[in-house]
Amino acid sequence: MNVEPSVRVEDKLYYNRYLVDAGHPHVRVRAHKTPSPQLLTLLKACPARCYELNDNGQVEVTVDGCIECGTCRVIAEPTGDIEWSHPRGGYGVLFKFG
């Protein structure tokens, strides 16, 4: 039996290409003094690791590597912690299943 070597998610994400819509991010974290449990969950739940804690203890998002999977939308949009919309036409991720 021939077993294929496993490939890390990060290695697969490397092949994707992105057309960033500068000045029009499709995800925004709303201003907060302390992060909600939902925002803290995004630090680990986002498969592209777009969310991080800054030096002031606030959650920030970098949409440049977003794969538009909707995980953050399901977790944090219902609570009002983020604003999420589809990228404008022609912008966003281009999957390259490498």
Swiss-Prot record:
Signal peptide: none annotated. The keyword Metal-binding applies. Keywords: Electron transport, Iron, Iron-sulfur, Metal-binding, Nitrogen fixation, Transport. InterPro entries: 4Fe4S_Fe-S-bd, ETF-QO/FixX_C, Fd_FixX. It holds the Pfam family Fer4_ETF_QO. One of its GO terms (molecular function) is iron ion binding. It comes from the Bacteria. GO terms for biological process: nitrogen fixation. The keyword Phosphoprotein does not apply. Residues 57-87 form the 4Fe-4S ferredoxin-type domain. Could be a 3Fe-4S cluster-containing protein. PANTHER family: FERREDOXIN-LIKE (PTHR43082), FERREDOXIN-LIKE PROTEIN YDIT (PTHR43082:SF3). To ferredoxins from P.putida and C.tartarivorum, ferredoxin I from A.vinelandii, ferredoxin II from D.desulfuricans. This is Ferredoxin-like protein. The lineage of its organism: Bacteria, Pseudomonadati, Pseudomonadota, Alphaproteobacteria, Hyphomicrobiales. The gene is fixX.
